[in-house]
A protein has these predicted regions:
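Active-site loop-to-helix "anion-binding N-cap" substructures in soluble metabolic enzymes
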Residues: 1-166
Length: 166
């Protein structure tokens, strides 16, 4: 797999798969170790003025069903505070395709039908609407799912982020 530092990602739309599966207690991130581990890659992309769409999962929701207890909303809030910038939470693939935000996060990828089965259609939904797919979800690298495997094959370019590179 190529490395992030090998690609020109300046001003490109980047899909960034992270492992932000962190414990949430009373709506607040209880342990931000995984969030902090993602900052090197995120800061690199921000400095390059890439348009970043973050993908991650939280827990094990019933696929295709929204569960407010497993929403990434607290993660977005915590990450926004860490970076000192606003991050919007988007809830649909249409928003994923259409977004022009500097940085946003797609709601829990496991809410989307086809993630765990490595659905070709979900992988295409992810990979076809970005310029570069950066995989930096070391904790999920063993899973053959749409966002951890399929999208890498579909995206025009894909590479490892700094956490996976290490």
């Amino acid at each position: 797999m190529r490395l992030l530092s090998d690609l020109d990602i300046a001003k490109k739309k980047v899909g960034l798969r992270l492992d932000l599966n962190v414990p949430i207690k009373e709506g607040v991130v209880a342990d931000d170790t995984r969030i902090l581990a993602s900052l090197e890659t995120l800061n690199y992309l921000i400095k390059a003025e890439a348009k970043i769409v973050i993908l991650s999962h939280l827990g094990r929701p019933k696929e295709g069903t929204f569960d407010d207890q497993l929403s990434l909303r607290p993660v977005v809030s915590h990450l926004s505070n860490e970076l000192g910038i606003s991050i919007s939470l988007i809830n649909s693939m249409k928003e994923f395709h259409d977004t022009n935000a500097q940085i946003c996060m797609l709601e829990n990828i496991r809410f989307f039908e086809g993630e765990s089965k490595n659905s070709d259609s979900l992988a295409r939904e992810i990979g076809a609407h970005i310029d570069v797919y950066v995989f930096d979800a070391f904790g999920t690298s063993h899973r053959k799912q749409a966002s951890t495997y399929g999208a890498i094959k579909v995206a025009p370019f894909s590479c490892a982020g700094f956490l996976v590179q290490r």
